[in-house]
UniProtKB/Swiss-Prot annotation:
Keyword Zinc-finger: no
Extent of the TPR repeats: 125-158, 206-239, 246-279, 285-318
Name this protein carries in UniProt: Transcriptional activator NprA
One Gene Ontology molecular-function label: DNA binding
Pfam families linked to this entry: HTH_3 (PF01381), RapH_N (PF18801), TPR_12 (PF13424)
Function: Activates the transcription of nprS by about five fold. May bind to the upstream region of nprS promoter.
Amino acid sequence: MADGIISVSYLSKIENNQVVPSEEVLRLLCQRLGINNILKNRQDELTSKLLLWYKTITDKNRQEAARMYEEIKRTFDDVQGAESIAYFLLFEMRYHLLLKDIHTVEALLIKLRELYDTFDDVMKYYYYKFLGLLYYCKEKYEDALEYYKKAEQRFRSQSFEKWEEADLHYLLALVYSRLWRILGCINYAQHALAIYQSEYDLKRSAECHILLGICYRRYGEVDQAIECYSLAHKIAQIINDTELLGTIEHNLGYLMSMKHEHYEAIQHYKKSLLYKRNSSLQARFITLFSLIKEYYVSKNYKKALANVEESLQLLKREKDGMTTYYEYYLHFTVYQYLLSEDISENEFETFMKDRVLPYFQRFKKYEDVAQYAEYLAIYYEKRHKYKLASKFYKMSYQFLKNMINI
């Protein structure tokens, strides 16, 4: 039976489960025996494993996704089927996006681009979707939207599970939110929410409620925003999800800040930080920065400065923190200048004009540009430099208009 394919001793090892044969060896042995369905069954089993792994990744179950990754990697040591390898690489890319391991994702992308011409439409759907997510993680939101839209085109011509449709629409809603395209965000978020509710996916339903709350807040619909956050809060308590509770408390803080209820805003931000004590530095910095701003506008400068210094220390202790979290380095340093008495005025001007404003303009973070241009205008006005003050007040106004007109 094995003549011309493998040695008798190797065949014996296969029969005794001492080695796992390659796909090619299995194919040749099956041909010799006149059996056609063994490879297909193995392929189907592998595809099912990969799709289950992908669903686990999409559900953000990091621990189980890591366990499955190691198990599937061992399986793939002997897999030579082009289709299986393509799906493995695609879902491996999605796994490393979950981990925010951008360096590994970009290395995988090189391999995937080499295989692109062999992809069918389903593979191309995943490819564009994950490429959109990569650009989203890199804060290149226009590029992210472009690739999500390409994925959406492929999605319409194929048959997918409803949860896949909901996930794509949620990602589209997220990127529309980042681009301040509020109607688009509401449309996709509501569609995703309807699917998640029909499938009793509580966590993803809560995420949609949070996103809708952000949209209504931006429209000034405070009561609707509170209703969305309240629904999300109830769900988060039911499923005991501290990560969600941290996000909800943060957004409630932002809402109270909009209403100039500074004490309530600060309490929500503090609760958020308690829930986020085991979260990523990125998640904690978002709330620390909001807390600093709230102390600043409520004129509690001592606590504002204490939080600035604590945040900068966290940055410095983190490996590559100053580059990984450069945006927050800029934010915290701006407030360090504003709150400190012994820093050179020329340093502040140079820092704002050469580093802060260009950075936030480049990444189209118009709210930050408007705020920091106003701070610079106030700085010049206090020093009777009215021409420069007028220039930066106009700049602030223009970027506020950009936010409204997006």
